[in-house]
């Protein structure tokens, strides 16, 4: 890999395909450079981990219920379960799109540990970018000796 790369081919691939699978060296550092290049080209980047996402569609685009850590507290309703109250929050992608700056091209959902996503969840990420062109997805699928990327749709074939 060249010492200095501009990242233009990566940005073009993200803009063209919408969802990109990334393989980065395990020692790290490369993904930060590409995140910076995406920010400089006009995107807002949201970092997520694939572990614990649950229902990907609900987490990204719909209002969904969450429970904060209960810390041993009992439920106020008197059921006796140590589960706590349920709070409803908007989806991450929907909320970020509503608060997007005027000059921004859109948002990039940078998802680490993407190898835990099922095929159906990966297909949803591809269809999400096709349905809403302001949302782009970059999924880190694993490690490699050099930074490489390809459209996520090609990985599903």
From Swiss-Prot:
Q: Which UniProt keywords apply?
A: Membrane, NAD, NADP, Plastoquinone, Quinone, Thylakoid, Translocase, Transport
Tell me a GO cellular component.
Answer: plasma membrane-derived thylakoid membrane
Record-linked InterPro entries: NAD(P)H-quinone_OxRdtase_su_N
MF GO annotations: oxidoreductase activity, acting on NAD(P)H, quinone or similar compound as acceptor; quinone binding
Report which reactions are catalysed by this protein. Answer: a plastoquinone + NADH + (n+1) H(+)(in) = a plastoquinol + NAD(+) + n H(+)(out); a plastoquinone + NADPH + (n+1) H(+)(in) = a plastoquinol + NADP(+) + n H(+)(out)
Membrane topology type, per the record?
Answer: Peripheral membrane protein
Q: Write the Enzyme Commission number(s) for this entry.
A: 7.1.1.-
User: What's the short name of a Pfam family annotated to this entry?
Assistant: NdhN
Out of the domains of life, which is the source? Bacteria
Broadest EC class assigned to this enzyme: translocase
Coarse class of the primary localization is membrane
Q: Where in the cell is it found?
A: Cellular thylakoid membrane
Entries under PANTHER family matching the protein: NAD(P)H-QUINONE OXIDOREDUCTASE SUBUNIT N, CHLOROPLASTIC (PTHR35515:SF1)
Complexes and interactors: NDH-1 can be composed of about 15 different subunits; different subcomplexes with different compositions have been identified which probably have different functions.
Q: What family does this belong to?
A: Belongs to the complex I NdhN subunit family.
Q: What does this protein do?
A: NDH-1 shuttles electrons from an unknown electron donor, via FMN and iron-sulfur (Fe-S) centers, to quinones in the respiratory and/or the photosynthetic chain. The immediate electron acceptor for the enzyme in this species is believed to be plastoquinone. Couples the redox reaction to proton translocation, and thus conserves the redox energy in a proton gradient. Cyanobacterial NDH-1 also plays a role in inorganic carbon-concentration.
What protein am I looking at?
NAD(P)H-quinone oxidoreductase subunit N
Protein's organism? Picosynechococcus sp. (strain ATCC 27264 / PCC 7002 / PR-6) (Agmenellum quadruplicatum)
Identify the coding gene: ndhN
């Amino acid at each position: 890999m060249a010492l200095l790369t501009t990242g233009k081919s990566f940005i073009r691939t993200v803009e063209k395909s919408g969802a990109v699978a990334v393989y980065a060296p395990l020692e790290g550092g490369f993904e930060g450079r590409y995140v910076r290049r995406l920010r400089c080209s006009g995107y807002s980047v949201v970092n997520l981990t694939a572990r614990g996402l649950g229902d990907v569609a609900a987490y990204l685009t719909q209002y969904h219920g969450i429970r904060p850590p209960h810390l041993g507290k009992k439920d106020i309703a008197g059921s006796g379960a140590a589960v706590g109250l349920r709070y409803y929050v908007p989806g991450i992608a929907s909320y970020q799109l509503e608060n997007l700056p005027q000059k921004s091209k859109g948002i990039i959902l940078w998802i680490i540990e993407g190898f835990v996503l099922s095929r159906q969840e990966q297909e949803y990420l591809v269809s999400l970018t096709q349905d809403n062109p302001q949302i782009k997805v970059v999924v880190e699928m694993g490690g490699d000796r050099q930074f490489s990327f390809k459209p996520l749709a090609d990985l599903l074939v």
